[in-house]
Regions:
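A surface/extracellular/periplasmic glyco- and lipid-processing/surface-interacting theme
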Residues: 1-214
């Protein structure tokens, strides 16, 4: 949206713009897909772009990891959580859902009535952790239906892993800070090693998400 472009083109974000053409040299189009949803880049291209633009690649001295993780031999089992074998998300068109596989301990994602496949690997998307982050939302542009999602005010959510789910809260001190997630007793959540899927959920639709023991 034009609102996102305003933010991307500000000094707040190190931006490699492949939308308006400024950084077009670092992107390519996959002609097997329909434009405009066929623009891609690579890690090598982004590294080259950062060098070209002179972006700082060093972490600040006070940097801390975005997430906290357990070790492989000390899994967070969420013993007090509700059973979460299926997680159905309320999106009118895609109607996505996750199904828990007890054999490998991963959640496999589906949408549009079928498996969601990673185009680069040919494999179904699967993650170890799911975070549902409930956010306030409003219409920024009623004509085009552009949503304004509030990522700063904090709120509720769910943490899902190993076939269980627990309620959480989330906070973000400022736009320059990272989002932190907490258990109901105020402890920062400990994720299990593996991929983590953060699902942004509008507060108005959060009650329509379903976590079940199916």
């Amino acid at each position: 949206s034009k609102y996102a472009l305003d933010v991307l083109n500000s000094s707040f974000i190190d931006n490699v713009d492949g939308i308006t053409g400024k950084g077009g040299a670092f992107y390519y189009r996959d002609n097997s897909r329909r434009a405009p949803h066929n623009l891609y880049t690579t890690g090598e291209n982004l590294a080259s772009a950062m060098k070209t633009y002179g972006y700082d690649t060093k972490l600040p001295e006070n940097y801390t990891s975005h997430y906290r993780f357990t070790t492989e031999d000390s899994q967070n089992l969420l013993d007090q959580g509700e059973v979460a074998k299926k997680v159905s998300l309320y999106y009118v068109d895609a109607k996505p859902w996750f199904v828990y596989n007890e054999t490998d301990g991963l959640y496999y994602r589906y949408e549009f009535g079928d498996k969601q496949i990673d185009g680069s690997t040919g494999e179904q998307l699967a993650v170890k952790n799911i975070i549902l982050q409930n956010c306030y939302s409003s219409l920024k542009d009623s004509k085009n239906g552009t949503l304004d999602i509030d990522y700063l005010s904090g709120g509720s959510g769910m943490y899902i892993t190993n076939g269980k789910a627990v309620p959480i809260t989330w906070k973000r001190a400022s736009a320059n800070d990272i989002t932190r997630y907490y258990t109901q007793d105020g402890q920062e959540i400990i994720l299990n090693p593996g991929k983590t899927w953060v699902e942004i959920v509008e507060n108005s639709r959060a009650s329509q998400n379903k976590i079940s023991a199916e």
